[in-house]
């Protein structure tokens, strides 16, 4: 680590899921300290684990805000809900609109000034991180369904015992 730089290891998984491989030396990125147990929570919980990428399709100013529209794959969009959280390039934002192909967020002046988001343009790729809660719920429901299916397949009932000569 130096006065104006730091080094970090990057895993192949990060390269596959993110736009990191398309950045060049000197590219600006958004960095934030990790949350500690003493930290006051004042916003969305962001883990830094990228779920995939999206493409900015539109940026338009409205009064003091900028609307940003992003398209993404269904595997990412399924976790995005209106008024829920989405992280774009490490910036935690609230979703204003979502449909089957895209979502929209509104960038307030403070976010515009303190992050790199408005240096992007239509056609640029952005990293996306969805709210973790939706992924946990989906996983839990999958396991509940799988467990029920497995239990019904191997349940020992009186008819099972009779079919196999035990009654």
What are these regions (language model features)?
Residues 1-167:
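Conserved loop->alpha-helix
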């Amino acid at each position: 680590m130096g006065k104006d730089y730091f080094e970090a290891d990057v895993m192949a998984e990060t390269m596959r899921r993110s736009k990191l491989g398309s950045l060049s030396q000197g590219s600006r990125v958004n960095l934030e300290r990790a949350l500690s147990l003493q930290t006051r929570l004042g916003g969305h919980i962001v883990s830094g684990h990228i779920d995939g990428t999206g493409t900015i399709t539109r940026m338009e100013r409205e009064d003091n805000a900028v609307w940003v529209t992003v398209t993404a794959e269904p595997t990412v969009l399924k976790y995005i809900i209106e008024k829920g959280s989405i992280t774009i390039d490490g910036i935690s934002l609230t979703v204003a609109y979502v449909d089957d192909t895209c979502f929209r967020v509104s960038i307030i002046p403070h976010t515009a000034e303190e992050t790199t988001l408005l240096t992007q343009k239509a056609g640029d790729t952005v990293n996306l991180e969805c709210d973790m809660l939706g992924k946990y719920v989906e996983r839990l429901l999958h396991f509940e369904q799988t467990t029920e299916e497995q239990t019904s397949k191997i349940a020992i009932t009186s008819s099972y015992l009779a079919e196999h000569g035990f009654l």
